[in-house]
Every structure is written in C-alpha cells, then in structure tokens.
Amino acid sequence: MQRDEERPIDFGMSLELPKTPNDVNYVKKLITQILYLQTLVSEQQKKIESSTLEVQKKKDQIRELERIYEMNPKSFLTLRRTPALKLLPETLSVELSNEVNLTSSTTSSCVKPSPYLTNCNLKNKDTFPVSKNNCSLSSGIFTNSNGTNNCFSTHPKSLDDAKDNVVPKKLNDTDQFPLWSKNETIDPIDLGYSFISPFSMSFASKGNEILDPGESTNKNLFYEFPNGTTEPFEKNSVHSGKETLQYSATISKWKAMIEQIIFQNDQAASLSLQQQLKNEDIEDNINLINTILPFSVTLMKNKFGNFLIQKCFEYSTEAQLQSFSYFLKKHVKELSIDAFGSHVLQKSLEIYPERFTNNLIEELIECLPATLMQRHSCHVWQKFFETRRKSLVDGIFDHFNKKMQGKWLQVSVSEMGSLVVQTIFENCKEKDKRTCLDEIINNMDQIICGQWGNWVIQHIIEHGSEPDKQRILNSLLKEVESYSTNRYASKVVERALRVCHVTFFDRYVKEITTPQNELPTIFLQEIASNQYGNYIVQYLLQVATPSQINLMAEHLKKHMVSLRGHKYGQRIAALVEKSKS
C-alpha cells in the first residue's frame, strides 16, 4: 500500500486575494498575510536555531566517542575476569569474578569500563544488569527466559539509562553462590552512584586519556599520581535507598549545569555552582568538586568555567588539589597560552602549596622561551616570579637560566617578553638574574633601539645596580649622536638625563658640545634639528646650570637661521632667545 503523499505546507499562500487592487479589503488581507508569514518565519528560525545547537552538541558527543573508539576499540569491551569491585565485600567480588553470566553480544558496545573495574582480560562479550523481567541487556535487546525478545529503541549509553529497569536478582535462585544466605539480594542502589554510573565515573577517573593503540588491555585504568596512589580524587559519599535517588538527581543537575557552561557559555550556571561551593556543607563541596573534576581541563579554557575552577581551588581537599595539579601539569602548555586557562594557572601559583607547584613550574620551563613571549603565558611567568617561592626559586633558577642561555635578546625585544624581563629584575635575587642582565647589557645596541626593548634598558637605568648603570651610560656616550636621534633610544637617553643627573648630565653636555675630530661641527646641532633629539635639547636648556645653558646657546646661535626654518628647531630657537634675556 502506497503512502499518502504528504500535503505541502503552503505558509498561507493558498489565501485567495481579491483581484481589485484598490479594494480596502484587499489591502487588509494582504497585510494580514504578510504578518502571518513573518510570524511563521520567525518561529521557524527559532526552531532551526534551537535544533542546530542540539544537533551540534550531539555531533560533538558522537565525534568524541568515535575518536575514543578508534584509538583503542578494545578498551570499550566489557570486562570478564577479576572485576575487583572496590565497593563490594571481598567474598562477593571473588564469587562474581568466577560466576558471571555472560550473554551473547556484538563487540561494538559503547559502555566504558567502570574505574572500579581494573586489571581486566577482555573477551568479545558484553555484560549488562538484569531487568525486571529477568532479562539480560545485550546490544539493546531484552532476552526473556521464554526466548522472546523485547527491543530497546536505542542501546543504553550507560547503566544510568537502564537503572530504572534494574531490580535485584535473587542469588538463591541458583546453586552457584553457596556462601550467600537464602533470600539475600544485591541492590545496585545500595552500592552507590559510582557503581550505577560506570561510564561517567570512568571519565572522572581517566579524564580524556584513552589507552594508546597496542597497549595491553590489562593496564590499570587509573592515573598514577606523583604520590604513588592510583586514586585521582576522593570517592563521592555512598548513599542508599531514597537518599541515593536524590543524590543521583543532584549529580545529574550539576552535570547539566556544567554542560551548559561548556556548550553555551552560561555565566549563570557558573555563578550558581560557585555559590554552592560557598555553603558550609563539606560533604556537598567534596561531591560537587568530584563531579567537576572530569571536566576540569575543558572548564579551565572556558570563558566562565575558568572562574569555577579557580573557586574550586579554594574549597578543595588536599587530594582534590592533587588531582587538579595532575591535570594542570599534563596540559600546562595549552593552558598557559589560552586566554582563560592562563588565569587558572596564575591562581594555582597563588593558592597551591609549594609541593604542588614544583612539577608545574618544571613543565613550564620545558616550554621556554616561547611561553615567555606569548600574550597569555607571559602573565603566568610574571605571577611565578612575583610569588617569590624561596624553595622553588633556589632550585629551579639554575635550570631556568640554562634553558634561556643565549635567548634573552630575543625575549627582550618582544612585547610580552620585555614585561617578563622587567618582572625578573624587580623580584629575583642578584645571583638569579645576573645571567639575564649580562646578556642584555652586552647586546644593548640591538635592544635599546627596539620598540619594547628600550623599556628594559630604561628599567636598568632607573632601578639597576650602580655597576650595571655605569656600563649602560658608558655605552650611551660612545654612540651619543646615534642614540639621541633614534626614535626609541632617545627615550633612554632622556631617562638617563633625568635619573642620573649628577653622574651623567655633565658628561653628556660635554660630549655633545665638543667638536669631533677637529671639525667645527658638533653633535648638539644635529640633535637639535632632529625630530626626536630636539626634545632632549629642550630638556637640557630648561634644567642645565646657567654656565651649561650659555655654552649650548653660544653654539646654537651660529645656526639660528637653520633652526628657525626647521620644523623641529623653532622651539629650541625660542629657548635660545629666552636665554639671552
């Protein structure tokens, strides 16, 4: 039987209009039709936008699962031997490992092993819970005891999707479990949320890392942390009965809010979770932070999620801080160059105890010198130098200087690198910054003429030690004309005249008013007529001693005609005339 053809939507186009254009009713109906069509278009656009977001969201989830599956399909096969259920009694775990009923299934299951199931030998079998009808879930099908099949519309993505259909199976129905007393049952609800939702908890423990192709499937599924443990964070509290249902609903609500932050940049959701962390219920805080942990790296790089992670640092236990520290270390480079992730790293340097930041700084050093010159990561380095962690700085600066040897010139002439260099000058010990200072002063001729490097030289002149100042001032006098007429170097010369008035001012005036190589021309004339140097001469004529002003005025009078006719010399000519009176 053929299907009836679907009637096309006419969007009101079938509305018959009078043929007389001058009819008032014609105009009214035309306006009505236009408004009707506009309303339809507006509603359709809203639906399309909403559908597009949902479709994109689902596509992202599918792509992530496909990527994980392609990397190692074996890690998606369910577990068969020695499940090692941490929440079960030891005797129960042993019996389950020997007497697990497996149903036939395809190998394409998307249920990821629970983090509480480790050291597994995988076969091409899937294990699912028992349904209310005493059925086993396999590939989306209930197989009843009478042989009939009841199909699921979709394969459950995790045990969460099927937990409403799960009931306790009486273990006294068979003779396979002699140690259990009669009429005893296992209720998954009593085992806690971690057992009910292995898919989500596996990501909480394993993060985004999947076993590489070729790795043994017997590999422990936990991260191994620097302290030698395999627990990434504290387990959520185990509840039972109705409390667990309420607890599961709370976890689901938190996850939904995290999803809103990640996919929709929802500021309100971020603020709401931050507010919940401020309550006095320590248990709720631990559970909330444990729920956030699996998504921590993604949230760190999110516009509003990064504030949530920073707030988590303030309320985390030591174990949770260590978990965050592990993720920070693993992704330190990508976080440091991210606009929002860099803020999280800066916060960690402020709030973390020193034992947590050792490895973090070591990883940052391996990314040198690129991270010193990047727009966002440079602020992480500035925060590190400003924290003045004595135990860290003493041991790390040797490694830091060795890594940066021969690269300070490149860093000093960059916009962000020059800021980091000045921060080092302000906050580090003399022995730690000596390598940097020597390399910069030795390459001063290239740095001083740079748009950003000139600020580094000015900083040394203003705040450096006396020997370093003298080395720079001597270099300025050797190339006095060149530096005084350069766009950026002239700023350094002016800064030296203002800061080192006693030691440098007289030497500079003498240098620019003394004829060179027995020629009548002097540097003062060239500097006064230069578009950048004329500001230096103006400053000299205003603050010099009377004898120095008279000396410079006598030299400049000889060139008054050219000064008055020059765009940049008119102001100097006026000052010379003023000095006469």
Curated annotation (Swiss-Prot):
InterPro entries: ARM-like, ARM-type_fold, PUM-HD, Pumilio_RNA-bd, Pumilio_RNA-bd_rpt. Pumilio repeats lie at residues 291-326, 327-362, 363-398, 403-438, 439-474, 475-510, 518-554, 555-581. It holds the Pfam family PUF. Keywords: Meiosis, Repeat, RNA-binding. Residues 225-580 form the PUM-HD domain. GO terms for cellular component: cytoplasm. One of its GO terms (molecular function) is mRNA 3'-UTR binding. SMART domains: Pumilio (SM00025). GO terms for biological process: meiotic cell cycle; nuclear-transcribed mRNA catabolic process, deadenylation-dependent decay; post-transcriptional regulation of gene expression. Gene3D superfamilies: Leucine-rich Repeat Variant. It comes from the Eukaryota. RNA-binding protein essential for meiotic progression. This is Meiotic PUF family protein 1. It comes from Schizosaccharomyces pombe (strain 972 / ATCC 24843). The lineage of its organism: Eukaryota, Fungi, Dikarya, Ascomycota, Taphrinomycotina.
